Amino acid sequence: MTVPNDDTWGPATSVGTTATMAAAARAIATRDGVINDPFAEPLVRAVGVNFLTRWAIGELVASDVDVEGSPWGLAQMPASIAARTRYFDEFYADAAAAGIRQAVILASGLDTRAYRLDWPAGMTVFEIDQPAVIEFKTTALARLGAEPKADLRTVAVDLRDDWSTALATAGLDSSKPTAWIAEGLFGYLAPEAQDGLLDAVTALSTPGSRLGSEAVPNTADMDPHAARERMRAATAKWRDHGFELDVDVISFAGERHDVGAYLQAHGWTTVATPMAELLADHGLPAIARADDDRQTMNGVTYYTSTLGTGRQR
């Protein structure tokens, strides 16, 4: 990872581009009737990254820019993003049904759950992300005439800064259960920052709180040069179309704690769902296998965790 600690971004640059790519995949999955995110395509258009806009609206076909059979291409993204979208949608529906009335979306990006989910009365949704990302999405959705279906509190702060204080200032009541999600986030945090975020979530949570998270595997023993070259070869045609996303620059490798085990050690109970199982559960196509699936979405695991009464501070 070479991004400096003081780097910032919007939805068209650096890490923010990955949020726009995910929104483009949601736009395709929406058009295919797999999920329903009516704001995904308009937001991608508003960001203005030509490659992603063309893909989102169907002008660019994945087979035109993917290496045939590659597990790293665009072709697998709509299904995998749709599966995780359903997972976290259902996570919030279950949390609300259990009486939780505070939701926190960490690194919210172009997430539109505050606007598209049917929240119960009294629900407060907190979105945390970079100031430029928050400002862009809020402005773009207002121009579309979209209105949140819950009490939406935007928290414009970098997760590398004191976001806990900013969240409390925005009105989070840590004496009441909270439903948190960390979707598409941990791969862009250093291993120690991942632990720090989980510690902060635990400190701000009361028993009965829930956390939905997307966990990436350990890659400490991988040859970083070989991994980088495999990714660059798989995305070579993207660059031919004017789009380059150097995942090696914006993501972190290294030895990570297993998210499920780490949370259990801090008082949470966890239920794990591997990506392959999630895709199968929703009748979605499997992702092509790789020599080492830790570099693909096949290596991702989803956790639903609940904080018990014996948590470890």
From Swiss-Prot:
UniProt entry tagged with the keyword Membrane: no
EC number of this enzyme: 2.1.1.-
Annotated S-adenosyl-L-methionine binding sites: 129, 158-159
Keyword Methyltransferase included in the entry's annotation: yes
Leader peptide range in chain numbering: none
One Gene Ontology biological process: methylation
Family: Belongs to the UPF0677 family.
The protein's name: Putative S-adenosyl-L-methionine-dependent methyltransferase MAP_4064c
